[in-house]
Amino acid sequence: MLLERCVSETPGINGGYPVVDGTRTPVRVIVEFVRQGADEQHLQRLLPHLTLEEIRCALRYYETSPARVDEDIERNARAWNELQSRPWPA
């Protein structure tokens, strides 16, 4: 599967950062699961809507464009930290 056919960046979807084409699954999610030790079979169980080919393609995309995906990981982490720092409504 060609990278340009399996990963897309569309304004308004995941902030324009890369997602598996035809889904709203960010490439960063797959990369973060792999960093936590998930193998391909585990990824298929965690993300059953993705084919093994789509998972592999997303990982190849990361190999060729790590800065873009890492930027999305950092952006997501900052957003999460900001949410965690807000007081919960009573």
Feature roles, as predicted:
Residues 3-19:
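Short, Lys/Arg-enriched N-terminal segment that forms or immediately precedes the first helix
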Residues 22:
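Anion-recognition interface
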Residues 25-90:
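Long, charge-rich, low-complexity alpha-helical segments
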Residues 1-2, 11-12, 26, 76:
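A generic short-segment signal for beta-strand/edge and adjacent turn/coil regions
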